[in-house]
């Protein structure tokens, strides 16, 4: 079974991070094939730190079976996120 996870890397009081979490949860209502995991910057797993340079927040990372398919920093519209998900066959 494949495990699709969208990680949202955040920091304390990051309002853009909350916004991105809301956008992803809205997308998830129509596409329940992935889970969303919110992680504080200080708790990011080593395998993510080794593969993604965290320069700003939110950093959103799309993974499939712990393989990073795509990542971006900042807040995007739901339409743009859906396009990314379609482009990477997520």
Where is each model-derived feature located?
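Local sequence-structure signature of Cys/Sec-based thiol-disulfide redox active-site neighborhoods
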Residues: 1-29
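Short Fe-S-cluster ligation motifs
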Residues: 43-58
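Thiol-based oxidoreductase modules, predominantly thioredoxin-like and allied folds used
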Residues: 9-11, 32-46
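Short glycine/proline-enriched coil/turn segments at helix->beta-strand junctions
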Residues: 32-33, 53, 65
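Non-catalytic, surface beta->alpha helical segment in thiol-disulfide oxidoreductase systems
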Residues: 56, 61-90
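Secondary-structure boundary motif
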Residues: 26-33, 90
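Short, glycine/charged-enriched secondary-structure capping and boundary segments
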Residues: 21-24, 51-54, 75-77
């Amino acid at each position: 079974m494949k495990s699709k996870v969208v990680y949202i890397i955040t920091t304390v009081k990051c309002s853009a991070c909350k916004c991105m979490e809301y956008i992803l949860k809205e997308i998830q209502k129509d596409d329940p094939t992935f889970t969303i995991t919110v992680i504080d910057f200080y708790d990011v797993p080593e395998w993510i730190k080794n593969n993604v340079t965290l320069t700003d927040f939110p950093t959103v990372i799309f993974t499939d079976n712990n393989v990073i398919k795509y990542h971006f920093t900042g807040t995007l519209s739901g339409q743009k996120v859906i396009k990314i998900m379609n482009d990477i066959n997520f």
